[in-house]
């Protein structure tokens, strides 16, 4: 799995809520998704951002990774800094979008796999 850490000039981060009816519905997360067979993480993240938000991104540097095991599966999540190069983020899959200041990140209900990154960003160290 891959996820984009997109930050605006005012310091706010882009997060999306998981749509109703999905696994972990309603939780806020960094946008992204699964790596398809034959894709690189970079290709997968660019595809997911277009499919989910209608934006083109430039994938920049890796930020961190997270491993989480739940009752359904093991998840290895790769987080990359990304910059929107075309389009305006639009919720194309029934999710909500929000731009959150670092201090607000810790107040959001998020999946366990995002917890360490949120702690880093909220502390200003990532």
Enumerate the predicted regions with their spans:
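Active-site-adjacent beta-strand/loop module that shapes the phosphate/pyrophosphate-binding cleft
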Residues: 8, 56-57, 65-89, 98
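Conserved Nudix-box catalytic region and its N-terminal flanking loop in Nudix hydrolases
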Residues: 12-51
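Short histidine/acidic/glycine/proline-rich micro-motifs that form metal-
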Residues: 35-36, 68, 104-106
């Amino acid at each position: 799995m891959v996820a984009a850490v997109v930050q605006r000039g005012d310091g706010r981060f882009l997060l999306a809520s998981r749509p109703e009816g999905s696994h972990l519905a309603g939780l806020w997360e960094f946008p992204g998704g699964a790596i398809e067979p034959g894709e690189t993480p970079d290709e997968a993240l660019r595809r997911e951002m277009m499919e989910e938000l209608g934006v083109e991104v430039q994938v920049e540097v890796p930020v961190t990774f997270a491993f989480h095991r739940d009752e359904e599966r093991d998840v290895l999540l790769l987080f990359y800094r990304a910059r929107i190069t075309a389009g305006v983020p639009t919720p194309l899959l029934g999710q909500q979008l929000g731009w959150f200041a670092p201090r607000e990140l810790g107040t959001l209900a998020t999946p366990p796999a995002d917890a360490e990154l949120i702690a880093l960003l909220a502390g200003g160290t990532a």
